[in-house]
Amino acid sequence: MARPALRISFLQACLLGALGLVLARAAQLQLFQGEQWARKAERQRTTRDTLEARRGSIYDRRGTPLAVTQEFYHVGVAPNEVQDRREVVRRVARALRVPAGELERRMRAERYVYYHGPFTATDIEPLRKLKGVHTEGSYRRSYPTQSIAAPVVGRLDADSGSGGSGLERALDDLLTGRPGEAVFIRDRRGRRLESPARRIREPVPGNDAWLTIDFTLQDIAERALEGALRDLDAEGGDIVVLDPRSGEVLAIASRQATGVGARPTAFTDPFEPGSTAKLFTAAALLRLGRVDSTAAVSGHCGKLVVATSARATRTITDTHKECGDLTLSEAITVSSNVAMAQFSQQLTVTEQFTALRDFGFGSPTGVEFPSESRGALKPPEQWQATYTRASAAMGYEFGVTALQLASAYGAIANDGVLLAPTLVREVRAHDGRLLYRHQPEPVRRVVSSRVAATLMRYLRQVVSTEGTARGAQLANYEVAGKTGTARRFVDGRYQGYTASFAALFPADDPQLVIVVKINNPTKGSYYGGATAAPLTKQMLERMLAARNTTLDLRRLQEAEPVPLAIPEVRPPDAVARVSRVAWPYRDRDTTAAE
């Protein structure tokens, strides 16, 4: 009897000991390691992930959306949380436009029924208060204006989602928000359920940017350029519209006749500006006092031989065969290469180089755009003393972008002060707080007010019956400007032409600088006066007719109308003189030589 009782007591003691150990372990886990094990369990059934932040939007100067981030939603249903299954099935199926039977079957078979959108806020509004129905927001980028201003605005990188080109890339840090963080629940297999259990940190949306671009002017510029490339059978071109009083870029268009998409060549591709650069040599001559209004050189009947070395020469020619003397003003008006080559010899190499550099050539403008070209301006020690000075005076042996050329002409229109061009007018936080507003940024004074006024007189004369830009004349407003025609340097040799025109409008108080550049027009004339100048006139007429542009029409209306100048003619020279008037419907082959 004693032995069985002893065994029972021993077993009871063992059981009590084991129970004690279990209780002790439980107490240890609960009291001393409970928090640690709870965290481990939490990690096993949950995961942390980032919450996407809304990317800031891009607008034109008047609030027209150019790039916006649209929120869309995904929807999930947790069957074990649903209280009224029939009602949930009915309302979810209707809102998401899915078969009710399919939803019912999935709710019986799956722990979490997930519908990947995109669904709009309107779609999910009826579901927001349903028990067991969860929504998850996400974002996608859209461009409401389609192709208009597309190279400027840019696009996102398809892989990273960050800015890939254009202003999307240049302003990426401003537009990108700060991601949030949330805890998501995992199922038994470790798969993440798409409904967040809780948010740890809310995402902060990115900033919004208002550009200097005027959507209406941009549309006019792009349509005009597209039509010109078609009508002139040209390879490509650029148009820049700039406010000379602020440096704000109002429109900037680039097109190529071949290839996919449009490259922003107005920022990236330098070209030899041709006769549009004659104004900068004139500016240096006037600023340094090397010429006055009476100083003149011979036109040499349109042909001048210039030494390029001790044994070599080159011949400079003019389309206009002027045999008499030409003043600086007249040389600009008729765009005489021969006269400007002679005038340039009154400047030293360093003086001419400095003049071009001061107008911004050879350096990036600093505009908010990736991969902007600095152009090409070789240092003075690489200039050939005589011929390079003559070449530079004619717009050769250095390269400029269309934006640089517009900025330089803007300095003349702005009383001689060069301003830094900009594409960004304003930046605001997601809650509307103003973070940045552009103010005109002077770079340097390039010429005095007096010299700037003199140059403006020269440019007004170019757009007259005596000048090379007769095709840019408007009926009621005066336009100032300078034409350009230059051989194109392609693949190591000169082939084809670049036609250009730099305009200031209105001439008495410029509100706009317009630079038009056409690459290798092959149908009709290739001269800037016969291609780019009439295109500028066409654009100005459309801008004046448009509503809601940056043009101050009240100021224009207060100005005294300027009629087209029709010269007095006499029978002996009637045909020659009348053919030089800028008739609205000129024959395409009637060109202005320059």
Label the model's feature ranges.
Residues 50-54, 179, 233-237, 421:
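Short, small/polar residue-rich loop motifs at catalytic or cofactor-binding pockets
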Residues 2-36:
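Hydrophobic alpha-helical transmembrane signal-anchor segments
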Residues 53, 68-74, 251-257:
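Short beta->alpha transition motifs characteristic of CBS
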Residues 193-237:
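Conserved, well-ordered alpha-helix/loop/beta-strand core segments that scaffold catalytic motifs
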